[in-house]
Amino acid sequence: MQPTATAAAIPSGITLATTTPTGQTIPVAIGTRCFALGGTLAAILNKPDGSGIYGLIVADAAHDVTGEWGEYGQNVPNAKGPDGAANTQAMLAAGSPIAQAVRALNIEGHADWFIPSRLQMLALYESVPDLFDKDSWYWTSSQYSRYPAWCQDFEYGISTAGSKDYSFRARPVRSIQLQPFTPSQLPQPIAEGDPRAILGAEVAA
């Protein structure tokens, strides 16, 4: 039976935000295009350890990597969990060519890209299938056994095992921290006559 990817439950009326590398707090929602973060917020998930939630940023299709999963006939024991970043690191250590290509990416100053796990990929299918090519198969970072690894279809949502020596696409993603957001966190407009309007925002109110 195919597992179900359960998105994080966000209480009614709660807005989420993240912080950019420059320290700016920005509200986000599924489908938000975040140039400063390298792509589109595509899923909001519970952390595997239950310590909170996180968001998955999906890179544009132009950054897709195509190739073999690698390590055909080899067991990669640490590439079976729900954390795509940890799986990708295990693939990298084993010599996977697509893991090497994804980890070498630098998009908008971010170099922490990874291949999503099977569960993360299922969440992407549930939330943003239109960001993926319906005629392509996409590798996940989740190994099935020594010979196949899990791959994902975005036309019918099929998650199946494909031979590691097949050449499929891999979509880079990265994770971001999310926190509750209130409008007061946004920079407030400077009123007319405020000294900061003349001397600069660094002047104390």
Enumerate the language-model features and the residues they cover.
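C-terminal, surface-exposed recognition/capping segments
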Residues: 1-9, 110-112, 118-205
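GGW-centered surface loops in extracellular recognition modules
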Residues: 2-65
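A broad, low-specificity signal for short, low-complexity segments enriched in glycine/proline
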Residues: 15-22, 73-78, 102, 133
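Intrinsically disordered, low-complexity, compositionally biased regions/tails
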Residues: 17, 27, 35, 42-43, ...
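A structural motif
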Residues: 19-23, 27-30, 100, 167, ...
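Short acidic (Asp/Glu) patches
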Residues: 35-43, 95-99, 154-157
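Short aromatic-cysteine micro-motif
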Residues: 45-114, 118-119, 124-127
